[in-house]
Regions:
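Conserved metal-binding segment of the jelly-roll/cupin
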Residues: 76, 129-148, 155-157
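Residue-level signature for short turns and capping positions that connect secondary-structure elements
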Residues: 78-80, 106, 143, 151, ...
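Short, flexible helix-coil linker/hinge segments at the edges of structured domains or between repeats
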Residues: 108-112
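Short, structured beta-strand/loop micro-motifs enriched in basic residues and often containing a Trp
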Residues: 114-121
Length: 208
């Protein structure tokens, strides 16, 4: 019997207004495979992915990100932390733009923390040009941000915790800014990871 995944669309302030949008808000993420994903058989039977694969805890989440605008500067928890570690990788599918990845070599911890608190943290991060076919790994504890104009396939460990360090002071449709998690984020940074990220190019087949 053949089963198909039923995707879940998630609205995000930085998302894309396209035919996949849900309601009137931009869709930023489409979750294709996660613990709550429903699988539908050719006979119409539905079952949760975690039950189908008999896997607890479910190890990964697979989704696409549709970024019309820059995502927040953020970091995910690392090893020996609570909540659990969150590694992830991005495969660039469409568009071109930049990815912020890791703290620039030679930046002191004190200078970085000051930059986070005064809103100049972007200047402290490595900037990578990204295009279809590129693959970039984001180990837990790496400060990063996806740039606008990119569509990426993201595979991550099953942890949904994100600490926002900077969000450009933007406001949602209700006029509210999104919550920042400065202290938690700084505590989650892997300070042993400095310098430019490794980027693998041409490993994902791009249309054309």
């Amino acid at each position: 019997m053949i089963y198909r995944c039923i995707p879940e669309k998630v609205e995000r302030i930085w998302g894309s207004l396209d035919p996949l949008r849900a309601g009137g808000e931009p869709v930023g993420e489409i979750w294709w495979f996660h613990p709550g994903t429903e699988l539908e058989s050719t006979g119409g039977e539905r079952v949760k992915a975690s039950s189908f694969f008999r896997c607890e805890p479910f190890p990964v989440i697979l989704k696409t990100l549709h970024a019309a605008r820059d995502l927040s500067v953020q970091v995910h928890p690392g090893r020996d932390r609570t909540p659990p570690m969150k590694d992830e990788s991005w495969a660039i599918l469409e568009g071109s733009g930049r990815i912020l990845h890791g703290i620039r070599e030679g930046t002191s911890r004190e200078a970085f923390e000051d930059a986070v608190r005064n809103g100049t943290v972007v200047s402290m991060l490595n900037s990578l040009n990204a295009s279809p076919g590129d693959l970039i790994h984001l180990p837990a504890g790496t400060v990063h941000a996806l740039g606008g104009g990119l569509t990426v396939l993201e595979i991550q460990l099953n942890c949904t915790v994100t600490y926002r360090l900077w969000d450009y002071r933007r406001r949602d449709s209700a006029g509210n800014t999104r919550e920042l998690h400065v202290e938690q984020g700084l505590d989650a940074v892997d300070w042993a990871r400095w310098g430019r990220a490794d980027k693998v190019t041409g490993c994902v087949a791009a249309e054309g």
